[in-house]
Regions:
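Conserved SAM-binding loop and adjacent beta-strand
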Residues: 1-16
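Conserved Class I SAM-dependent methyltransferase catalytic core
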Residues: 3, 129-185
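Residue-level signal for inorganic ion chemistry
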Residues: 10, 105, 134, 192
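Conserved SAM/SAH cofactor-binding pocket of Class I
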Residues: 12-97, 101-104, 110-118
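Mobile active-site "lid"/loop adjacent to the S-adenosyl-L-methionine
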Residues: 106-133, 137
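Short, structured loop/turn "capping" segments at alpha-beta junctions
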Residues: 110-113, 145, 170-172, 199
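SAM/dcSAM-binding transferase cores
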Residues: 182-228
Length: 228
C-alpha cells in the first residue's frame, strides 16, 4: 500500500471525539461512525480503525482505481468488519446517519498547476473538490459535537482558515509541520468544529538536523511503525 506522509500525519494526529450527540443520546468514540473523504488507498481509515477499536469507518473515494485499492486494503486488514468503502462523489452522498468525525486529505493544487494526467489532477487538484463545498458538505454530515480534521499545504491552509471562519467553523487545533527546523512550514494539520472553543496551537518537526526522524515525529507514529 502506498503510504504518504500527509495521510500518516493526519491519521495519527486527529483528535478522536470523546462523545457526540446522536438522536439526543451521547455516543462514545468507540461506538461512533467516522467518515474519510477522498480516502485514496484507505490509509487514514485504517489508522482510525486501529485507534478507535469499535468505531465504524466509512471511506468515500471518487476514483475507481483508488477505490479498488482501498477496498482490497480493507479486506486484508484485521479491521475489515468495521471498514466500508463507498465508490462515489461526496457532494452527492446522502447518508441516513451523521458522523462524529470527518477526516480529509483534500486535493490542493491550484488551477494554474494542472497537468496532462487526468487522474493525478483529480487526486491533487482543488477543482475536483472545491474547499468551500467540502466545508458545506462536512457541516451537513457532522453530528452535533462532531469535528472536521484535514491537512493542507501551508499557503492554502491560511486561506482555508479564513474561509472556514466565514462559514461558522471554529478551530479546535492547528499544527504547523516542518520538514526541518531551518525550513518554512510545509503543511498544516487542522481540526474544526461548529461551536466556539479555545484552539490548541502546535508545531511538529519531522527531521532532525542530521536527517534522522525527530523524537516528536517518532512519538506521534510509534503505534503505526514497528521501527519507532
Amino acid at each position: 500500500m502506498k503510504v504518504g506522509t500527509d495521510g500518516l500525519l493526519l491519521g495519527a494526529w486527529a483528535s478522536l471525539p470523546t462523545y457526540v450527540s446522536l438522536n439526543g443520546c451521547a455516543v462514545t468514540k468507540d461506538s461512533a461512525a467516522y467518515l474519510d473523504i477522498g480516502s485514496g488507498s484507505g490509509l487514514i481509515s485504517l489508522m482510525l480503525a486501529q485507534r478507535a477499536p469499535q468505531a465504524t469507518i466509512r471511506a468515500i473515494e471518487l476514483d475507481s482505481d483508488a477505490a479498488r485499492q482501498a477496498e482490497h486494503n480493507f479486506r486484508q486488514s484485521s479491521f475489515a468488519s468495521r471498514l466500508q468503502l463507498l465508490k462515489g462523489d461526496i457532494l452527492t452522498y446522502q447518508p441516513a446517519e451523521r458522523y462524529a468525525l470527518i477526516v480529509s486529505n483534500p486535493p490542493f493544487f491550484d488551477n494554474a498547476l494542472l497537468g496532462s494526467n487526468g487522474k493525478r489532477n483529480q487526486a491533487r487538484h482543488t477543482a475536483s473538490l472545491p474547499l468551500p463545498l467540502l466545508l458545506a458538505k462536512a457541516a451537513e454530515l457532522l453530528a452535533p459535537g462532531g469535528s472536521l480534521a484535514l491537512v493542507l499545504p501551508e499557503p492554502a491552509a491560511e486561506a482555508f482558515s479564513q474561509l472556514a471562519g466565514a462559514q461558522g467553523w471554529f478551530a479546535m487545533a492547528s499544527c504547523q509541520v516542518f520538514s526541518r527546523a531551518d525550513k518554512a512550514p510545509l503543511r498544516r494539520l487542522m481540526q474544526w468544529q461548529r461551536v466556539p472553543c479555545q484552539p490548541r496551537q502546535q508545531q511538529l518537526l519531522i527531521h532532525n538536523d542530521d536527517g534522522s526522524y525527530s523524537e516528536q515525529y517518532r512519538h506521534l507514529l510509534r503505534d503505526f511503525y514497528l521501527k519507532f
